[in-house]
Amino acid sequence: MAAKTPLLKAENVGIQFGGLKALSGVTMELHQGELIGLIGPNGAGKTTLFNLLTGVYVPTEGRIMLDGETLNGLPPYKITRKGISRTFQNIRLFGELSVLDNVKVAYHAHARHSMLSSIFRLPSHFRGEQEMEEKAIEFLNIFQLDSVKHEKAKNLPYGQQRRLEIARALAAQPKVLLLDEPAAGMNPQETKELMKLIAFIRERFALTILLIEHDMSLVMGICERIYVLDHGQLIAEGTPEQVRSNPKVIEAYLGEEVS
């Protein structure tokens, strides 16, 4: 039986900034519907890899493929349209816009009405705007943000801002969702709720998810496989149990707390 083609693949990917190799020889695969963790010490290259996968950086070696199509050199907005969306370690919402408008902005990448219809205020413009608003409200309901939809994003509590950023990333209708430390700054109860939310949206939207996170209870609790980076190179890959007991991982990152 032939092996399944990965949905997202990084093949011997690396990037060099001047004389510094930030990543080297990174190979990883994500298959449809998987929820995969990416862990490692600070400075290991995790966010750099996300920046490569989303077109913020261009690899100096190797290639990145989505559905078998090479993405190297494509600008971030084209990669978003092809099906990769992300959140950021530092929240990047439009603080002065409402919660609703933050989600609607993401839908414009897939807007069916043209710029001309918007300029001339044609009926198709109003139909398209109404459709986007209805979809945005649907997402806000899922993320329990519908009651604050008219609030400015900057006025939300931290946990709600995190949920809004995930809702906005989902509104871009991705095949692959990259979550960069979504539990950062959350208390244990918020983290527990986030775990349930991530599992729910994966099933609801048939998502493939790659997750960077330092909260090991979250990673070990919801991820099927985990990749481990250290000094820009992959040092391990496997199930949570395999990674937890890997001597290289324990030495580089986890320590005795999970051994």
Label the model's feature ranges:
Residues 2-259:
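Glycine-rich phosphate-binding loops of nucleotide-dependent enzymes
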